[in-house]
Amino acid sequence: VESAEYAHYKNAGYSLEAVNWWVYEKQDVSFDIVPPWTTNNYHWWITKLYPGQYMPMHTDPHTHDSPCKRYWMPLQDHQPGHIFIYENNLVKDYKAGDLYSYIKSQDMHGAANIGHTPRVVLQVTEFI
């Protein structure tokens, strides 16, 4: 089933067959991450964008069904060409381990890597 967001991307000229990024979740790795800032149920994943990869502006479907808080944590210091935007905010000059909280859980966000090294971040959804 094609989502309205997917149709919007296609109408804007994106070829989503050419868009890819790597996602690592708990079941994909041999470790767990327990965010120290929450005691509620949560879901985490790590995204990795290689140079030339991007994620169009989007919302995450799992934030549409229940109240939640969203967090974004870079796992490396900001590097030239590593781009993260949520709503009208360009996040830059960050350090590995900095924690950013979305203003609203369904804020539009997107990322790109026009640099020369992989871009790796942790994303956490806390269900409240």
Give residue ranges: language-model regions.
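Short, conserved beta-strand element in jelly-roll/cupin
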Residues: 48, 64-81
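Asparagine-centered strand-capping/turn motif at beta-strand->loop junctions
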Residues: 108-115
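Conserved metal-binding segment of the jelly-roll/cupin
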Residues: 92-108
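Non-heme Fe(II)/2-oxoglutarate
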Residues: 1-40
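A short beta-strand-loop-beta hairpin characteristic of the jelly-roll/cupin
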Residues: 74-95
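A short secondary-structure junction signal
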Residues: 56-60, 81-87, 112
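A short hydrophobic beta-strand segment most commonly corresponding to one strand
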Residues: 69-75, 99-101, 116-128
